[in-house]
Amino acid sequence: MYQGKKVVVVLPAYRAALTLEQTYKEIPFDLVDDVVLVDDKSPDNTVQVARDLGIRHIVMHKKNTGYGGNQKSCYDKAKELNADIVVMLHPDYQYTPKLLASMITLI
């Protein structure tokens, strides 16, 4: 929660099994209320890693919809969770989730 606003991090995932744990563990949970992972029919064990990490909101596509389709599913689920602030974080560790605190406080 940030200034009374519900913060949801969305993770559009594809083949993220090897990087998801590192990404997830750096999320600033003092500001983030929920995490959503949308798996775009990954051929690896991304979903199992997400479950093992305790991610509660996992959406699994039955077919690969591409990056745009994955983003849409992320935002749809965040809306369903009544998010006030949605931050998209790539679970392949392109950048550190430690930057989220700076991003959220700018909103």
What are these regions (language model features)?
Residues 98-107:
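Conserved donor-nucleotide/metal-binding helix-loop-beta segment in metal-dependent transferases, i.e.
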Residues 33, 47-81:
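Conserved donor nucleotide-binding strand/loop of the catalytic core
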Residues 65, 93-94:
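Acidic metal-phosphate-binding loop of nucleotide-sugar-dependent transferases
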Residues 16-19, 42, 96:
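Donor nucleotide-sugar binding loop of glycosyltransferases
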